[in-house]
């Protein structure tokens, strides 16, 4: 229902306009206070790159963060990552991730980023505290990437990157809750890079698509082409589950059942195992896999995806960030 409201297919969005105006008024006032220096920002001693969204819902932001971290690491840059840690609840903050950190403590996306990149990752409701924790333990970190936080204006940033779903784009264009917008589309004029996940990019936007890899067994780590798996039940607890189901079909998989879950939804063995019957195979996202690995069964697999950016702009962006991190 919410997708139909935000896309404009349902007329119910008009009923929510008063709340949207209030949201826009408050969020605009907050940003104005920071622009006029009525509210103080905090600046880290190293460059900060924000990777965020203008809209609520999944846009492919986490794969972009992983791509960015890996690309900088390949260039010899030591990277730290900070996040709010949505879906997690630590005993205390800031929390610096380790091999023993669970998604219940840190949230699924920070754990995924940590496992994929081996970068220093910290979570905290106050992102400046997370940055301080990283730099205290890893003083050699040269640049910080913040996963989300475009609207967290208390944190000064050197580069802003926005990720857009190229198919859904901005829906009906209204602020939450009548539409999907955290900020209006005009905000794009002030950011450094706009990455468009799928669809048809517009002038100045960087095209991106998600490239699926081989399916990975949660228990054994065995890999195979996902099309070889039979009697598949697909599960996705991400911001936009239909994208994952479409990816499976693109790979030649016709799921017997597709199960969309809420983003950051907590999972347990009983609930997940109930999704599959005897002889069926469960295929989930990598983001779900980090929550399920501890209690996985032999017929559970996940399909990793990697962000693939095209054109000349990614190289220019990476050169800019490498120069920033190197102090040039």
From Swiss-Prot:
Gene this protein is translated from: lpxK
Q: Which PANTHER family match?
A: TETRAACYLDISACCHARIDE 4'-KINASE, TETRAACYLDISACCHARIDE 4'-KINASE, MITOCHONDRIAL-RELATED
| Reactions mediated catalytically | a lipid A disaccharide + ATP = a lipid IVA + ADP + H(+)
Q: Which GO terms describe its biological process?
A: lipid A biosynthetic process; lipopolysaccharide core region biosynthetic process
Described function: Transfers the gamma-phosphate of ATP to the 4'-position of a tetraacyldisaccharide 1-phosphate intermediate (termed DS-1-P) to form tetraacyldisaccharide 1,4'-bis-phosphate (lipid IVA).
Matching InterPro entries: LpxK, P-loop_NTPase
Q: Which domain of life is it from?
A: Bacteria
UniProt keyword annotation of Transmembrane helix present:
no
Check the record and name the Pfam families matching this protein. LpxK
Tell me the first and last residues of the signal peptide: none
* Cellular component terms (Gene Ontology): plasma membrane
What organism does the UniProt record list as the source? Escherichia coli O7:K1 (strain IAI39 / ExPEC)
Q: In which pathway does it act?
A: Glycolipid biosynthesis; lipid IV(A) biosynthesis; lipid IV(A) from (3R)-3-hydroxytetradecanoyl-[acyl-carrier-protein] and UDP-N-acetyl-alpha-D-glucosamine: step 6/6
Similarity remark: Belongs to the LpxK family.
Q: GO MF terms on file?
A: ATP binding; tetraacyldisaccharide 4'-kinase activity
Name the chain's protein: Tetraacyldisaccharide 4'-kinase
Q: Where does ATP bind?
A: 55-62
